[in-house]
């Protein structure tokens, strides 16, 4: 049931933040969107469009926008953060002193903290303190399709069931399904790794390696998610759901995926700098590939596809050499016997 008195502040006026703010505003929640770009905020507040990130899509009249963070979160019942991973820590540090006691924070950011490789829930808990209700929103969702009202399903994971359900309720509607769970680690892992794996599938498509190669890479990429999840305390069923498999399939096959487009350009022989410049928005995989491999190396888990992507994005090897190395790997069983067993290590 919708609580019409519930005020929501959405932080981040990029494509995803705008899409989520428009979604909850259409569900009759008083919603204010915060962003740094004055031009973007003015276009939303006056013309009802985000001309930079979601051009030609009209936004609801009830959605307000501001560049004043304090004004955005004042009186908010909860906050939804939708900034790139590189801005996550800074945004929370600015947010923390402005929050009233008991105000929950959810985020739709995907990735790890750059530099440290920490999960975002670890960053949030450290900055916001031990009592703040926290949740992560993830799953297969292109911002443009959400804003157009096309059918979408996501999942919200958190340790506080009441807050998790509150976030899901605000998003859930006739064309947008929001499921719930309590595996924050698994939800964050899937959302981060799929960006890295999408680069590999994009490279294969750019090199015209065929649909068989695409399917094989997606499946083996899912295997890498499961291998890492087994040693960090995540549950395999989370990775087999919307947070893992669902997001992986969308990001690896959808032409709206920036990470897939990056890989496709590299597979066609374009330079990394030119490909990023043409995309024109943040491509999370460039940073996240380092953090995924940091996690893998810390836990002694082999992730050959992710490792190859990191090497390509560091420009240590060519995309062709990366694919050749993957195909030359020794034959082995498809799954380790302990992969789906609880409390096991790889």
UniProtKB/Swiss-Prot annotation:
Its main location: cytoplasm. Pathway: Membrane lipid metabolism; glycerophospholipid metabolism. NADPH binds at residues 15-16, 36, 110, 143, 258, 282, 284. InterPro entries: 6-PGluconate_DH-like_C_sf, 6PGD_dom2, G3P_DH_NAD-dep, G3P_DH_NAD-dep_C, G3P_DH_NAD-dep_N, NAD(P)-bd_dom_sf. The keyword Lipid biosynthesis applies. GO terms for cellular component: cytosol. SUPFAM superfamilies: 6-phosphogluconate dehydrogenase C-terminal domain-like, NAD(P)-binding Rossmann-fold domains. The keyword Hydrolase does not apply. Sn-glycerol 3-phosphate binds at residues 110, 139, 141, 194, 247, 257-259. Belongs to the NAD-dependent glycerol-3-phosphate dehydrogenase family. This is Glycerol-3-phosphate dehydrogenase [NAD(P)+].
């Amino acid at each position: 049931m919708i609580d019409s008195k519930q005020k929501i502040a959405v932080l981040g006026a990029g494509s995803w933040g705008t899409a989520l703010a428009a979604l909850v505003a259409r569900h009759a929640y008083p919603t204010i969107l915060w962003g740094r770009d004055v031009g973007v905020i003015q276009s939303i507040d006056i013309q009802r469009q985000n001309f930079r990130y979601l051009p030609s899509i009209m936004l609801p009249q009830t959605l307000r926008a501001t560049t004043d963070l304090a004004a955005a979160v004042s009186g908010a019942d909860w906050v939804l953060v939708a900034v790139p991973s590189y801005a996550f820590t800074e945004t929370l540090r600015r947010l923390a002193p402005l929050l009233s006691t008991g105000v929950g924070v959810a985020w739709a950011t995907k990735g790890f903290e750059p530099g440290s490789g920490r999960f975002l829930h670890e960053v949030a808990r450290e900055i916001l303190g031990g009592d703040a209700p926290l949740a992560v929103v993830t799953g297969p969702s292109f911002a443009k399709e959400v804003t157009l009202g096309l059918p979408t399903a996501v999942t919200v994971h958190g340790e506080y069931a009441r807050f998790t359900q509150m976030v899901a309720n605000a998003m859930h509607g006739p064309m947008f399904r929001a499921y719930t769970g309590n595996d924050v680690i698994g939800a964050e892992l899937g959302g981060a790794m799929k960006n890295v794996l999408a680069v590999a599938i994009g490279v294969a498509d750019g090199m015209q390696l065929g649909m068989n190669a695409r399917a094989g890479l997606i499946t083996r990429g899912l295997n890498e998610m499961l291998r890492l999840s087994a040693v960090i305390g995540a549950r395999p069923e989370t990775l087999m759901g919307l947070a893992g498999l669902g997001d992986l399939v969308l990001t690896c096959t959808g032409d709206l995926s920036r990470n897939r487009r990056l890989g496709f350009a590299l597979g066609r022989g374009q330079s990394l700098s030119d490909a990023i410049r043409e995309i024109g928005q943040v491509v999370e995989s460039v940073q996240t590939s380092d953090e995924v491999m940091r996690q893998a190396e810390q836990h002694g888990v082999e992730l050959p596809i992710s490792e190859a992507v990191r090497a390509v994005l560091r420009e240590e090897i060519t995309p062709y050499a990366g694919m050749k190395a993957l195909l030359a790997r020794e034959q082995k069983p498809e799954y380790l016997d302990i992969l789906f067993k609880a409390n096991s290590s790889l």
